[in-house]
Amino acid sequence: SHAFPFVRIRINLLDSLRGPALVLRLIPQTILTMEQLKLPEVLTELAGRPKGLILVTGPTGSGKSTTLAAMIDWINRNETRHILTIEDPVEFVHDSKRSLIRHREVGMHTLKFHNALRAALREDPDVILVGEIRDQETLSTALEAAQTGHLVFGTLHTNSAVKTVERVLGMFPPEEQDSVRRSLSE
């Protein structure tokens, strides 16, 4: 992504049958609060939890990143926490307020989400945002982080709670799915 004084732009360049193509996604510089977005109060309660795994799911363009940015902003304004974001690319840039926030970009600061998440466990964050949980390694490490006292946020591209659970379990071999199901229910 690239920053300009009034907006950040996520740029994807690609080649196609008819030649090069460009996709631009505008990311506002100002992070809207949960109140401004009129998000349910339960999200504030979840953001205030000391540990756990919070998955924000939905199709492309449904507001997953905006919702997570608002939740991280709430923590930053109301809690004294060490927050680490791992994104590809970094979308919403938070300035530290009551919390210390550090951003890591996949491809620039780390090779993969999994590598950054594994390293994060040694960096003593309280809150970890994983921009997108794409594979079993990343999900396993996110579950481990949540079980060892971190508050972990992540996104998945699914359309319902049932599809989310199916997708999560489907990332694991059948012999591991019962264990993962128990981990998710804790």
For the regions a protein language model found, what residue spans apply to each?
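Short, flexible helix-loop junctions that flank or precede catalytic/ligand sites
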Residues: 1-186
